[in-house]
Amino acid sequence: MPQAADIATAPQRPSAPGDVVAAGQPPRARGRAHVSSKRRDDGAVALDTLHQSGALKLLFPTGRPDLEAVTVNTAGGITGGDDFALTAKAGAQSQLTLTTQAAERVYRAQPHQTGQMTTRLSVEPQARLRWVPQETILFQHSAFRRSLHVELADDAELLLVEPLVFGRVAMGEHLSALRFHDQIQIRRAGRILFRDAIRLDGDAMAQLKRPGIAGVLSGPCTAMVTLVLASPGAEAALAWLRTQLPAGKEAYGGASLLAPNLLHMRLLARDSFVLRQSLLPILDKLTEGSLPRCWRL
């Protein structure tokens, strides 16, 4: 049971443009965005459509062969009652990369209020999409429901990465109370190709340290990443990837082919710094040296 002092000092997300305020209620943020890429007649990849509203914005760095879209949450984070939705499409024969400007922070929520983020991605024939957001950081007493749905054409390619951090280790935060429900689903030509779900209610640290989950580490697991590569190059990537995976007491990873041209990797780490030490070389390789610059800032 949280003490009064905990409630008084718990970090609160500041109000921002896009917040919706009801009488007697704290501000709630709403954000919607849609982006799509296309291949022009001259062969260049360009922005096709763009819609954005509320607290979810998109930026477009230049100087890349693909279209890179960087999402920005102007609310400064997510808390209970917030609602965000993103849709993106890589048009036929185009390449689209999506990332976040910074790590997404999920703050303390009030009782019976849950923040939501829904993402829907589609990849058309001979197109490639890279979904490489930076970490999502879950705070003590946060409540967050997240879903990611991907639709792939028969010959479309996908690199999907979802890093997750459990609490602020440097501040000694222990996630003994939170609600986190996460779902990833990938379909190819209408058929389910991959499905993954995480459900943590209550003491997340106690659940994570159980054998068969993240108990392989010497201490608490406070960071993890899920990676999926759907590409004809998946089998060749697997052999190299296994040489890069850590197998120690501070970080541990595994990778396998779930089906032809479908690679899945999971990596656990003591903290987000250790996670990045293992993850960045992998992402550099799988993105052919074109990982978005915001990952280095």
Curated annotation (Swiss-Prot):
Query: What does the record list as coiled-coil region(s)?
Result: none
Keyword tags: Chaperone, Cytoplasm, Nickel insertion
Superkingdom in the source lineage: Bacteria
* Membrane-spanning ranges: none
Q: Which subcellular locations apply to this protein? A: Cytoplasm
A single GO CC term for this protein reads:
cytoplasm
Main location as per UniProt? cytoplasm
Gene Ontology molecular function: any one? nickel cation binding
Q: Which family does it belong to?
A: Belongs to the UreD family.
HAMAP family named among the record's database cross-references: UreD
Instruction: State the name under which the record lists this protein.
Output: Urease accessory protein UreD
Q: Which organism is it from?
A: Ruegeria sp. (strain TM1040)
Q: Which gene encodes it?
A: ureD
